[in-house]
């Protein structure tokens, strides 16, 4: 923010961070488009099945993934009343530093638990709520959302590849919701529109770097461990 000259350019705390996550969201769509496409198709098939009173057996993996994402998103609504207070913590370097250390510890420990086998077919609905709670807690500045949710998945016995995939797909409704809320503030005249070019640069860089990081993380997960 300091480099691009947009620090404090908005009365809405965290607006620039939200825009950066929008770039990462684009990267998620590109990296996981086959899975997301299947989920979209199954969403409409599910509506059709509901209208006709039918239920496929077994439930298609993509349809179950939709349910896991919905349940994993619910805990975010619990923290909405304190959203502004949490965003205000970004100015406290002690909080951010401690949160970064916690993220590192979570990733270190999670990489040393027994490798799990759960995927979208076998993960429990309660697992989705727990990972969703981890995502809600990761709204604290300094806590990595993806790192925290991936670690939570590993603790719950998720297959490493599924933990990564679920973490990033779970981010879609969260980031979309955050951007809708921030857009409302922007339309209210709280954004310095002269900084829009800097915002665009930030989003583009976040998209490119985000995609590269997702690809790298997928490759690392393929070997079954995140560490050496």
Describe the function of each predicted region.
Residues 1-228:
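Multi-pass membrane proteins that catalyze or facilitate reactions on polyprenyl-/lipid-phosphate substrates
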């Amino acid at each position: 923010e300091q480099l691009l000259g947009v620090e404090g350019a908005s009365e809405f705390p965290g607006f620039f961070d939200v825009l950066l996550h929008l770039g990462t969201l684009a990267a998620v769509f590109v990296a996981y488009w086959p899975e997301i496409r299947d989920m979209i198709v199954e969403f409409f098939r599910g509506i059709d099945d509901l209208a006709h009173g039918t239920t496929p057996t077994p439930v298609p993996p993509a349809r179950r993934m939709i349910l896991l994402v919905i349940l994993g998103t619910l805990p975010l609504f619990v923290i909405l009343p304190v959203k502004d207070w949490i965003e205000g913590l970004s100015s406290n370097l002690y909080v951010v530093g401690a949160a970064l250390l916690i993220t590192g510890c979570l990733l270190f420990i999670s990489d040393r638990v027994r490798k799990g086998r759960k995927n979208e077919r076998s993960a429990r609905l309660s697992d989705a709520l727990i990972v969703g709670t981890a995502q809600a807690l990761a709204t604290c500045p300094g806590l990595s959302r993806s790192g925290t949710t991936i670690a939570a998945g590993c603790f719950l016995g998720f297959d490493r590849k599924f933990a990564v995939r679920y973490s990033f797909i779970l981010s879609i409704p969260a980031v979309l919701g955050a951007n809708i809320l921030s857009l409302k503030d922007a339309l209210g005249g709280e954004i310095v529109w002269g900084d829009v070019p800097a915002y665009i640069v930030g989003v583009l860089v976040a998209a490119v770097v985000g995609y590269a990081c997702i690809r790298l993380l997928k490759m690392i997960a393929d070997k079954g461990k995140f560490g050496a």
